Amino acid sequence: MVFAAIPSPSRGVVHLGPVPLRAYALMIIIGIVVAVVVTGRRLRARGMDPALAGEIAYWAVPFGIVGARIYHVLSTPDAYFGEHGHVADVVKIWNGGLGIWGAIAGGALGAWLAARRLGISLALFADAAAPGIILAQAIGRWGNWFNQELYGKPTTLPWAVRIDPAHRADPGVATYQPTFLYEFLWNLVVAAILLLVDRRHRLGRGRLFALYVALYTFGRLWIEMLRIDTADEILGLRVNIWTSAIVCVGAVVALLVVRRPVDPDVSPQEQRALGLVQDRTRRQPTDAAGETAGETRTATRHDDATDGVDVNGADVDGADPSNVNGANVNGADPVNVNVNDADGAGAGAGEQPVAGAENGAAAVSSGRTRVERPPAT
């Protein structure tokens, strides 16, 4: 006996006068908007132009939709080219039928073309976009609920989804596993993990995107095993199960093999895009003898307007000499900046190297701080 069940919508389309508004398409549109907004905010946090999210989406979305439809048609050919299929239905995407793998492949191709035109690294953009993409997928899954499609095996669980007679796989069974809900919840979990990992460990170089792919495909594996809709099989397993397994393994390999390079190996463009240009150094208070009381910390900040080094709150720019703790910086391209210590002590005996801006080196001593910048190349 079923005590409760998730009801299905009576219809998946609403007519605004003569214009039909299909819920499936509406979910996709909402997902795209969310992805663009989230990605834009993450790009801004990285010091990049948030408008890049919309510019790349302008290419990625059409390519993704076409790729999703192509994958769906190729993975379920009988529905279109079989004995009872209709070739004309290939273009009717409003009736459902978009393969997520084709969407990812097509969207990646469109994003790559856009990134080349804009002159940015696709890997850097993909890391910023990963949480937004998985959120878009979560929202898009509700389109399956409106269309009463892609549900799982029959069940009497309280959270089962009730399917109308016209859409039932078995005329005698009314409730099924709500696979759309499982994938929605899993995608939210993946989004939370990505945001947490990115906050604590800036993976970089496309590794966060690889983590997104690995986590999503891992969840898709067991969700796919619950589905009972018609699909082609290889060795007794659905094609999507094989695809999920292969892509998951590939993503894990990429996550393990691709290492974040040390700063000298990162191009200036990528440093600016990720905010790796370190241009703000803050020292801990010193004791009476001039010894450094705490470790020197370097904050990461990206600034398109300046290429200088900020030492103790003052900017050092080759084109605009500044005064740093009482020491004037003269010249168009300063290399060494000597700063008298706050207690007035002279040069100390020892120096402690710390990380500087743009791979420059800084030495903190009891008497002076020296900031060295490498010659321009």
UniProtKB/Swiss-Prot annotation:
It comes from the Bacteria. The lineage of its organism: Bacteria, Bacillati, Actinomycetota, Actinomycetes, Frankiales. Pathway: Protein modification; lipoprotein biosynthesis (diacylglyceryl transfer). The chain crosses the membrane at residues 18-38, 48-68, 93-113, 119-139, 177-197, 208-228, 238-258. Belongs to the Lgt family. Catalyzes the transfer of the diacylglyceryl group from phosphatidylglycerol to the sulfhydryl group of the N-terminal cysteine of a prolipoprotein, the first step in the formation of mature lipoproteins. Pfam families: LGT. Keywords: Cell membrane, Membrane, Transferase, Transmembrane, Transmembrane helix. Residues 288-297, 308-344 have a biased composition (Low complexity). It is found in: Cell membrane. GO terms for molecular function: phosphatidylglycerol-prolipoprotein diacylglyceryl transferase activity. Its main location: membrane. A 1,2-diacyl-sn-glycero-3-phospho-(1'-sn-glycerol) binds at R141. This is Phosphatidylglycerol--prolipoprotein diacylglyceryl transferase. GO terms for cellular component: plasma membrane. Residues 265-377 are annotated as: Disordered. It is a multi-pass membrane protein. It comes from Frankia alni (strain DSM 45986 / CECT 9034 / ACN14a). GO terms for biological process: lipoprotein biosynthetic process. Its EC number is 2.5.1.145.
